[in-house]
Amino acid sequence: MASADRVTAPVDTVTTGPIEGSVKHYREVDGLRIPVRRINLTNGETFDVYDTSGPYTDENATIDLEAGLPKLRDSWDKPTVAGPRTQLAWARAGIVTPEMRFIAAREGVEPELVRAEVAAGRAVIPANHNHPELEPTIIGKKFLVKINANIGNSAVSSSIAEEVEKMVWATRWGADTIMDLSTGKNIHETREWILRNSPVPVGTVPIYQALEKVNGDPAALTWEIYRDTVIEQAEQGVDYMTVHAGVLLRYVPLTAKRVTGIVSRGGSIMAAWCLAHHRESFLYTHFEELCEILARYDVTFSLGDGLRPGSVADANDEAQFAELRTLGELTKIAKSHGVQVMIEGPGHVPMHKIVENVRLEEELCEEAPFYTLGPLATDIAPAYDHITSAIGAAIIAQAGTAMLCYVTPKEHLGLPNRDDVKTGVITYKIAAHAADLAKGHPHAQQRDDALSKARFEFRWRDQFALSLDPDTAREYHDETMPAEPAKTAHFCSMCGPKFCSMRISADVREYAEANNLTDVAAIEAGMAAKSAEFAESGGKVYLPVVS
């Protein structure tokens, strides 16, 4: 890391080492090393799962946080094409890039599908030329549903070391991208440490740092300050940027009757600027210049929903959908400049209004990937908003949303800590995987089937290893059955040895196999035997107690 980017409090250590029951493995595909988490099952089989943790779970890797991760993509081809060197431009030219081949191997699909979806604008590959450390991923509805984890300091909480650890911790448990939303001290330095050590794409909201440069006064913001901030972040390697260019002056009055007004930080900043100057947003008026900047680095637009609803009462209102129509216009402009685009969505939406959001986004924004914050399906559960939002997230992902921004238990209450980050990631991995199952994504059900088989065969350690959170699964089992023999017992503390339905089912199968019967025949034979026994006893319901 360049000395100019160093600070007096370096990051000394982060969480490393394999996840329980697994090892880091690399599959050689078409000259590329594709990372997977290989689970070694007790029956001698192995099971590979998609892995976002980078070298941090590789016990053979040497982690040097000062130097950063190996520059994986430095040696990859960057073909010459007319216009910008972006994944969108290459895809439109019919070129399958190394990033596309890498992604295809990770997803278990053909490289041509990756290229075609990127070319059509239905998928994006956030991969800044200046972030060679990342392992490429794709965001699009024909691929695995991705999740993002927000990290970042505030004016009152957290350090650089804590934020880097949050990044490593989030990717360990499955975060596909990270957003650094720092608003406190050392924003540039924090971002530099995260980028140089992040194996996944990193997103930002540049208006936050721009606001810091003018001491927190929205009215003092200028296009020049914002432009320079975007260039600064693009030079560092930021892969996608949230830009609230759809918050127009004429839309601000539409929020006046809302229960919760404008809840987006970026949206409120731009609304305040528009009202202070009574002029159209500089993000909107300078959008084409912004496109030219992002195209140089292949930074992906994440067009922000600055007027998203902050309560279920405000869901699907005119302010929200007016902004969405403008985002559709901006999507066309960005793509004409060869810049990849995804669209951000709500927010707080009751279940019966969720699918309408996806339908309109696809209609108005040319099916650009949808990236939503939840949405929260109800407003009544502070401290449990990871659950209220996961309900909405599963529904909206099944309907076609490509990436879900996680919500932690601290939502609306405070800055999430390390434990909150893990809870948010695991909760959203559940929602994303449930949607993958419902959409029939290739290979999605294989992990469910493997875990169900292990459960039926009482392979407890395999159940833990195949789960999204092996540590917690094992800890819960250990609370009541910590002894080593319990890890092969044919029951758990829920039902005990006599009432375990799976043990009884297994006994039926064993009886059937021993007597050359089908399961149904075995049950019928057992019932017949009991019937004969009842008749032999004289048909008595109550028999004498045998001491």
From Swiss-Prot:
Question: Which residue ranges traverse the bilayer?
Answer: none
As one GO molecular function, the record gives: 4 iron, 4 sulfur cluster binding
Residues bound to [4Fe-4S] cluster:
C492, C495, C500
- The superkingdom of the source organism is Bacteria
Has the keyword Iron-sulfur been applied to this entry?
yes
EC number(s) given by UniProt: 4.1.99.17
- Name the Pfam families on file: ThiC-associated (PF13667), ThiC_Rad_SAM (PF01964)
One of the GO BP terms on file: thiamine biosynthetic process
The entry's keywords: 4Fe-4S, Iron, Iron-sulfur, Lyase, Metal-binding, S-adenosyl-L-methionine, Thiamine biosynthesis, Zinc
Catalysed reactions, as listed in the record: 5-amino-1-(5-phospho-beta-D-ribosyl)imidazole + S-adenosyl-L-methionine = 4-amino-2-methyl-5-(phosphooxymethyl)pyrimidine + CO + 5'-deoxyadenosine + formate + L-methionine + 3 H(+)
Q: Which Gene3D superfamilies match?
A: 6.10.250.620, Radical SAM ThiC family, central domain
Chain sites annotated for binding substrate: N150, M179, Y208, H244, S264, R265, G266, D305, G306, L307, R308, E344, Y371
How and how many cofactors are bound, per the record note? Binds 1 [4Fe-4S] cluster per subunit. The cluster is coordinated with 3 cysteines and an exchangeable S-adenosyl-L-methionine.
The answer on whether this UniProt entry bears the keyword RNA-binding reads no
Which Gene Ontology cellular-component terms appear in the entry?
cytosol
Q: Where does this protein hold Zn(2+)?
A: H348, H412
* Cofactor field: [4Fe-4S] cluster
Q: In which pathway does it act?
A: Cofactor biosynthesis; thiamine diphosphate biosynthesis
Protein purpose: Catalyzes the synthesis of the hydroxymethylpyrimidine phosphate (HMP-P) moiety of thiamine from aminoimidazole ribotide (AIR) in a radical S-adenosyl-L-methionine (SAM)-dependent reaction.
Protein family per UniProt: Belongs to the ThiC family.
Protein name per UniProt: Phosphomethylpyrimidine synthase
- From which organism does this entry originate? Nocardia farcinica (strain IFM 10152)
Name the gene that codes for it.
thiC
